[in-house]
């Protein structure tokens, strides 16, 4: 994994931890509207998403190399005016969470992803490997990593909006 990809993951996760660290239970579980997730649910969704991304990346690493993987415009995920429907496997639980439990889940999923990336052979080029994404189709693995960071940024903005409305 190159330093840019690592930096993206590190930066987005640090921002997420920073915006949720001081939340009390009321703020953590407040739902601005019935169809809007709470901050706890957003964090659970990020955990579930990272697990799915890690599995896709791990499987993609084992595949053969490809020469011409088309780079997709993954930046549309940062547009908060565009709504996406999450697949069931990354839809959060409605069960209440403790902040410490969410932090543990987020640390666990990030550790698992980093372990997959660190364990791969040093001669593997992530831009020559791919995996199928449900929205974007075939994505190079370096774009999967970038998308994970962009997705997290999208939800950080959502969390900040919820926090602002509560203060």
Question: Residue ranges of each PLM-predicted region?
Answer:
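Hydrophobic packing residues in well-ordered alpha-helices of helical domains and bundles
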Residues: 6-9, 39, 102-106, 145-148
């Amino acid at each position: 994994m190159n330093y840019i990809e690592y930096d993206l993951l590190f930066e987005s996760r640090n921002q997420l931890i920073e915006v949720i660290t001081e939340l009390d239970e009321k703020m953590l579980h407040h739902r601005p509207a019935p169809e809007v997730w709470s901050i706890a649910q957003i964090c659970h969704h990020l955990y579930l998403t990272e697990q799915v991304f890690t599995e896709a990346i791990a499987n993609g690493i084992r595949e053969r190399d490809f020469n011409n993987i088309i780079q997709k415009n993954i930046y549309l995920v940062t547009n908060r005016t565009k709504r996406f429907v999450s697949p069931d496997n990354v839809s959060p639980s409605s069960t209440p969470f403790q902040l410490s439990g969410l932090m543990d889940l987020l640390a666990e999923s990030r550790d698992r992803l980093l372990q997959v990336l660190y364990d791969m052979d040093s001669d593997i080029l992530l831009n020559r490997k791919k995996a199928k994404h449900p929205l974007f189709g075939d994505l190079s693995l370096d774009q999967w990593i970038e998308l994970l960071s962009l997705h997290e940024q999208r939800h950080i903005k959502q969390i900040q909006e919820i926090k602002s409305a509560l203060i």
